[in-house]
């Protein structure tokens, strides 16, 4: 179960971005591979903050690595503590068409309305089936995403 926990002293720091597109959010269906976190789950685009890297640098790097895209602007919207993770959350708008993106990590890009995300099960067009959203991504959406549309 997803729980907020402010008691931990050391965290794994992660940057995550909510990419907004015409009233919807872009999400990534994670690969179905052993050894990765939350395989086969939908999540927002994110990455671990590396040594000597700021949360902003991390999200720029991750967006470039995962989508071959450089957003014109993004903004920091807050942080969320989820167990041992400290999530630095950003928001940006996709101004171009989704077809201009190239997914380099993950199985699929999905575009979902907030009401669909609320259901916690999102449809994959590639797999023709529903898959769960990661608990952390759902927590980030609950805290921040509902208020951005």
What feature does the model see in each segment?
Residues 1-27, 45:
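Conserved N-terminal beta-strand and adjoining loop/helix that marks the start
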Residues 20-25, 32-34, 50, 83-84, ...:
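Short, charged/polar surface micro-motifs in flexible loops or helix N-caps
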Residues 24-65:
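Conserved Nudix-box catalytic region and its N-terminal flanking loop in Nudix hydrolases
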Residues 37-41, 101, 112-113:
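A short, polar/proline- and glycine-enriched secondary-structure boundary/capping micro-motif
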């Amino acid at each position: 179960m997803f729980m907020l926990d402010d008691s931990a002293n050391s965290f794994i720091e992660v940057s995550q971005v909510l990419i907004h597109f015409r009233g919807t959010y872009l999400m990534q269906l994670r690969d179905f591979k052993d050894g990765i976190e939350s395989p086969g789950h939908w999540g927002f685009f994110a990455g671990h903050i590396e040594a000597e890297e700021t949360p902003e640098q991390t999200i720029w790097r991750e967006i470039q690595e995962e989508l071959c895209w450089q957003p014109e602007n993004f903004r920091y919207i807050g942080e969320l503590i989820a167990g041992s993770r400290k999530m630095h959350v950003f928001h940006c708008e996709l101004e171009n068409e989704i077809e201009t993106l190239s997914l380099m990590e993950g199985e699929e890009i999905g575009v979902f309305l907030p009401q669909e995300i609320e259901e916690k099960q999102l449809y994959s067009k590639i797999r023709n089936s529903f898959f769960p959203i990661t608990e952390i991504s759902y927590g980030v959406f609950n805290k921040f995403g509902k208020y951005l549309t």
